[in-house]
Amino acid sequence: MSLEEQFLTDLEQYPDTVSIVHSYIKLGETMKALKKENYTDVCKEEQELRKSMEGINIEELIERNFDTILNGVIRKKDILSFVNVLSYYYKDCQIIYNNFEKIVSAADKIGNLRDLRDLYIWIVHKPNGKEVFIENIDFILGLEHPEAIIDLIELVKGRNKELDAKIEKALSSHSNGIAKVMLERASEDNQIDNYVDTLEFMIKEILKSENKNYLDITRIAVGNGEFSFVYKIGDKILKVGSPRGEFKMPNHRRILQPLARKAFRNRLGKTMACVEISEEVDTNIEQKDPEELYKLWKELRDEGVIWTDVTWENVGRLKKKNIPSLNGEEMYVEPEAAGFKNKYKGKPLEKGELVILDTDFIFEENSPYLRWFNFGYAKSFEDRYKKENALDKEEEER
């Protein structure tokens, strides 16, 4: 039996296609290394193995039998593992690009939007992958799930009006799928699908308010720790992510006031994902004065609120008054509806003021859930605050 016949027999007999492919590629690489080193003192079995592999190129073997291999990969729903194995040994990824349509069609057929989206992200970060993705955009838009490109719109839009129109049509006709992609990235709980319609409605309302199209949805960042995906829609910011801290938190005027902030919970009451819509702020802070940051932090601390995730990445300057708006109108949002425990004290902050954007780790000072971190300014600010309070107390007692 030839090596290729043995390979096909193994694929037929064993369910773990990716492991079989991995083993044969590794075998081929080992044989090449041995041949290069010209080892002659080998056992009879290895001599026979070398003989069976003479003239055999494993990469070409995989290419010839790619359809058979892919059928096995589809059965296991293991596309990402498969391409990772191929790219590990074939760094130029050419074998993947040669079979791009087959691989993407298989992932699309499986229908796991999170994996399909991750596959596209994976491809564009490989050598020449961005160009391959762009070249194949017409093919991708014709698949059953074109919405999986939602995080990569910036790569393909603006090239010509015809393509932009095609992208918009594909996305707008799969608006439910866009919401599903975002939520499935935040949670693997099957019950997250119960909130797809809710997020779809929220996105449509933002687009309407900002007079924008689906083509204008831009992923601008992956939040700190990769817990949130952040999208810009006009002057609004949409965050979709996994929960990190307590959802309910104390309110303060130094916190960016959201238009909407929702916790999506399963039937057991466990939070699967958090969604927040807020106004865009200026995060390009050129003069980063720690004293200004301490002043902000101290305002909260004086009111019994502790913010423990203090970094410049988590603040920004207001572009307008700290009041959310919709359709050009300022909106009053009940604190409880936005996950706050209370109304904040004082007047809304004006344009140019520094506010907190990331609210995952804001606690009441006596909270049993309070968490400190070894990074950022919070610990040093707390130490300074206690020393200053102790000095003030000494002054009063004199």
Identify the residue ranges that each predicted region occupies:
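ATP-binding glycine-rich phosphate-binding loop
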Residues: 177-178, 184-234
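Conserved structural core of kinase catalytic domains
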Residues: 254-293
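C-lobe/activation-segment region of protein kinase-like
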Residues: 292, 298, 302-308, 316-398
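Conserved protein-kinase catalytic-loop position immediately C-terminal to the HRD catalytic Asp
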Residues: 313
